[in-house]
Design a protein with these regions (language model features):
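Short S/T/G/P-rich N-terminal loop/turn motif that feeds into the first structured element of a domain
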Residues: 1-68, 80-98
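Low-complexity, intrinsically disordered Gly/Pro/Thr-rich segments
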Residues: 71-76
């Protein structure tokens, strides 16, 4: 299968702390890394953010998700977010770039 994107949507009063906490946990060698990670703010809903993670494959994403580093990252981020996180798990079917 092709590329895979996971979007994690969440609410926070301190996005800088969320980003700092996420970046404080390195991904060890041997664990698949996202090809890109983008943090975005929802202009229509103050305090709502999403992290967009792109992987080479679904399998890479699942191996990354199962890693101890990811569990540690989630433990650091969770107290900085409010309510439930929403996950979007997306297979890339087509992409056009300019």
């Amino acid at each position: 299968m092709g590329e895979y994107i996971q979007i994690v949507e969440y609410e926070s009063d301190d996005i800088d702390a969320v980003i700092e906490a996420a970046n404080s946990v390195p991904i060890p060698d041997g664990v698949p890394k996202p090809t890109s990670v983008t943090v975005v703010r929802d202009r229509d809903r103050p305090g709502m953010y999403a992290t967009i993670l792109r992987f080479n494959s679904y399998e890479d994403a699942m191996a990354h998700s199962d890693s101890d580093a990811t569990h540690e990252r989630i433990a650091k981020i969770s107290p900085l977010t409010k309510g439930d996180r929403r996950f979007y798990n997306l297979d890339v079917l087509n992409e056009t770039t300019s």
